[in-house]
A protein has these predicted regions:
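The feature captures the beta-strand-to-loop junction immediately N-terminal to the Walker
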Residues: 4-6
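Helix-to-loop junction immediately C-terminal to a conserved catalytic motif
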Residues: 19
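Conserved post-Walker A/P-loop segment of ABC ATPase nucleotide-binding domains
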Residues: 22-30
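ATP-binding/catalytic-site motifs of ATP-hydrolyzing domains
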Residues: 28, 34, 180
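ABC transporter nucleotide-binding domain catalytic core, centered on the Walker B motif
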Residues: 32-33, 72
């Protein structure tokens, strides 16, 4: 599950309330019938990966991962076994003796993930865990993180402001606005059938054409349709981003880069789209 929304919407506060770092002013937080508000944070059985990873710099990778097990009083033999298994799971089996300073950002992120998973938590909480990585590494880690989550099967709550990340990693998203959930559901459902104007405008780009909302990637250039003049076109690698002046206002168009010749700035074009859901 991904908690998604703009800065200040309450997603991180919600995660902190689940973790026990912030007390809600009213209500309850229930896990398997238990009210977590009556349980101390350390006893809630939650694994947490912080945005900064929060690794201990004076400990090796193995010692960092073992820390939670030590706090639980797990015997040394069992502790070593579970640490080794978890490091293999995240692809760091050969890095147990290294220190965090000797690891890349992506490797440190996996150490933090291993430390959270090794205690076998009821719920895994991820607080923008990929935000410190560069764009390419972030995409790679999204794939790895999803595979690991599928392998262990632990219920996971992810906080992110990155829409692509939320859609790539989650089975359900909670779109939040000013402390409220505007929509809860599968990512594709929230994107294709937004429940509120806020969700429609927040998830991706949206055009309002003749009273209807149309996603930019649903619009193509045709022989007839809504006539307009290309104001700007921007090449963004795998796609072209267009802004077209029409009688209905400025319309944004996104077309995949297929290698075909695309309209130039100043060209007259006709915009067409399918209104079917």
């Amino acid at each position: 599950i991904a908690l998604l929304g703009p800065s200040g919407c309450g997603k991180t506060t919600t995660l902190q309330m689940i973790a026990g770092f912030v007390d809600p002013t009213a209500g309850a937080i229930r896990l398997e019938g238990r009210n977590l508000l009556a349980i101390k944070p350390a006893k809630r059985g939650l694994g947490i990966v912080f945005q900064s990873y929060a690794l201990f710099p004076h400990m090796t990778v193995a010692e960092n991962v073992a820390f939670g097990l030590e706090m639980q009083g797990v015997a040394a033999v069992e502790r070593a076994k579970r640490v080794a298994e978890t490091l293999e799971l995240v692809g760091l089996g050969a890095f147990a003796a290294r220190f965090p300073r000797q690891m890349s950002g992506g490797q440190q992120q996996r150490v933090a993930l291993a430390r959270a998973l090794v205690i076998r938590p009821n719920i895994l909480l991820l607080d923008e865990p990929l935000s410190n990585l560069d764009a390419k590494l972030r995409e790679e880690m999204q794939i790895e993180l999803r595979q690991i989550q599928r392998t262990v099967g632990t219920t996971t709550i992810l906080v992110t402001h990155d829409q692509a990340e939320a859609m790539a990693l989650s089975d359900r998203i909670v779109v939040m606005n000013q402390g409220r959930a505007e929509q809860i559901g599968p990512p594709h459902e929230a994107y294709e059938r937004p429940a509120t104007p806020f969700v429609a405008n927040f998830l991706g780009k949206t055009n309002l054409v003749n009273g209807a909302t149309v996603r930019p990637e649903k619009i193509s250039f045709g022989a007839s349709g809504l006539t307009g003049k290309v104001r700007t076109r921007i090449f963004q690698g795998n796609h072209w981003l267009y802004q077209v002046d029409t009688d209905s206002g400025l319309v944004t168009v996104i077309r995949q880069n297929t290698g075909e010749t695309m309209p130039a700035e100043g060209a007259l074009v006709h915009l067409v789209w399918d209104m079917a859901p």
